[in-house]
């Protein structure tokens, strides 16, 4: 199983540390490479970091979008996260998790097939259950 993680929030770091042993390959994409420098626990053979603009489809493809089974997005801004999620929705066989601060719009995007996580009450069990379902 492969996962693409877009952004560099603390929530993504927590999720990544949980997934590191459960996922074959982890790909990270963020526009600011220096943010990954404090993620030393994730410096492993199955982890690759990409630097680039997540809103551009070419960058997403280069970072492993097409081969990813699981995509987790937290751009730090809900509108940006939702925009990137819609760009990532080219492969209908993957699951896209979006971390949002404003849960008032979550129903709309869940109806579109996205899995929404609340940034203030991160339900990591949703991610773990998804992974276990496919192992």
Question: Can you say where each PLM-predicted feature lies in the sequence?
Answer:
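Cytosolic regulatory regions of ion transport systems
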Residues: 1-135
């Amino acid at each position: 199983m492969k996962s693409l993680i877009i952004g560099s929030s603390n929530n993504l770091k927590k999720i990544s540390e949980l997934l590191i042993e459960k996922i074959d390959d982890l790909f990270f994409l963020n526009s600011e490479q220096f943010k990954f420098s404090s993620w030393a626990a994730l410096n492993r053979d199955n982890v690759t970091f990409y630097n680039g603009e997540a809103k551009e489809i070419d960058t997403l493809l280069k970072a492993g979008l097409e081969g990813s089974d699981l995509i987790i997005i937290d751009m730090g801004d809900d509108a940006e996260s939702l925009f990137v999620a819609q760009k990532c929705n080219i492969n209908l066989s993957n699951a896209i998790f979006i971390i949002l601060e404003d849960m008032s719009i979550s129903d709309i995007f869940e109806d579109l097939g996205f899995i929404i996580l609340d940034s203030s009450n991160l339900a990591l069990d949703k991610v773990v259950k998804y992974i276990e379902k496919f192992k």
